Amino acid sequence: MKIIHSENLFSYSFKTLSSYYVIVGNVKHLIQQSTNIILNLAKKNGFSKMSKIIFCDPIYINNIILSAKSQNLFFKKKIISISFKKYISIKEVQNYILKLKKYLHTNLLLIIYIYSTNTNILNKINTKIFPPNGTMITCTFFNQNNISIWTKYKIKNIKMNITKNAENLLIQYHQGNVLHLNNTLNILSLVWKNKLINTLSITNFIEDCSIFKPLQWINALLNNNLQFSIKILNQFENQNFNPIILIRYLQHDLLTILLIKRDDVKNYYNILKNRNTNKNRHSLIINYARRKHYKTIYKSIKLLTLIELQIKKNNTKLIWLPFYTLSIIICL
């Protein structure tokens, strides 16, 4: 069984159609991209009709088996798409595949979706029980290195002419948000079709289109990107953005970082999980906690508390100046 990781989706050569595909993960746009690639390849191989089945009860497996039995070389080619419910175990999925595998043939294509938020899902799947003529595609969150790989092949796939510095600027700006990065690349390929895209093009595009969110400001701070964090603060100030929202977001991350620094067992991921921190921000927060001294974090929390006290006293005229000071403290 072939395994394709989502960051290599665009680099993989989908020339031969597999008998079945297993798409594992929870990142919707990656799942959709994988599905589109499979369906386009299936169409070239004479498949057109697709039946969608969402498993609610094991009894549905019998309906699929009956459908599979009815497909032979004299019937039209058919695609069966099976989406397993979120609560189903990997073991149950594998049992269903075992029942279905003897009915796989050239007129039947299976696309199986397994929803999972576990980035180590492959460790729980025994790929040996699957028939060898299938392909598994993982659609889970990327780390920073995987984002660079995915971006490189995405750019190649859409035939975009872009400098390396401009590519790095895009990755840095999107702060790990692959969905927004994907949308931006698609737009850029249309706006600057057949033209070289440089850092100036990207900077102008970002300035024209940007509507920043609190997490983008915090991610810029934790990446020590002072210039970008100041730019975001400028926009928030001009928009009269509610500063309490910024305080709450930053308080959460600073307290999480403090807990990580205090943890003697180095069980960082349990702390992040208990603090409901998004998985694609784990490495960012851990790396910042490792780099920075206690004094920087305590000083930042103290200043953040003073800013909140000023807001509660309705002294909002000079509120934004301490935010700029806070940005400098956190970044330096």
Curated annotation (Swiss-Prot):
Name recorded for this polypeptide: DNA polymerase III subunit delta
Classification via PANTHER family: DNA POLYMERASE III SUBUNIT DELTA
EC number of this enzyme: 2.7.7.7
Source organism of the structure: Buchnera aphidicola subsp. Baizongia pistaciae (strain Bp)
Gene3D superfamilies named in the record: 1.10.8.60, 1.20.272.10, P-loop containing nucleotide triphosphate hydrolases (3.40.50.300)
UniProt keywords, alphabetically: DNA replication, DNA-directed DNA polymerase, Nucleotidyltransferase, Transferase
One BP term from GO: DNA-templated DNA replication
Record function comment: DNA polymerase III is a complex, multichain enzyme responsible for most of the replicative synthesis in bacteria. This DNA polymerase also exhibits 3' to 5' exonuclease activity. The delta subunit seems to interact with the gamma subunit to transfer the beta subunit on the DNA.
Top-rank taxon: Bacteria
InterPro entries hit by this protein: DNA_pol3_clamp-load_cplx_C (IPR008921), DNA_pol3_delt_C (IPR032780), DNA_pol3_delta_N (IPR010372), DNA_polIII_delta (IPR005790), P-loop_NTPase (IPR027417)
Oligomer and partners: DNA polymerase III contains a core (composed of alpha, epsilon and theta chains) that associates with a tau subunit. This core dimerizes to form the POLIII' complex. PolIII' associates with the gamma complex (composed of gamma, delta, delta', psi and chi chains) and with the beta chain to form the complete DNA polymerase III complex.
Enzyme class: transferase
Catalytic reactions on record: DNA(n) + a 2'-deoxyribonucleoside 5'-triphosphate = DNA(n+1) + diphosphate
Family annotation (SUPFAM superfamilies): P-loop containing nucleoside triphosphate hydrolases (SSF52540), post-AAA+ oligomerization domain-like (SSF48019)
GO MF, one example: DNA binding
Recorded GO CC terms: DNA polymerase III complex
Family: Belongs to the DNA polymerase HolA subunit family.
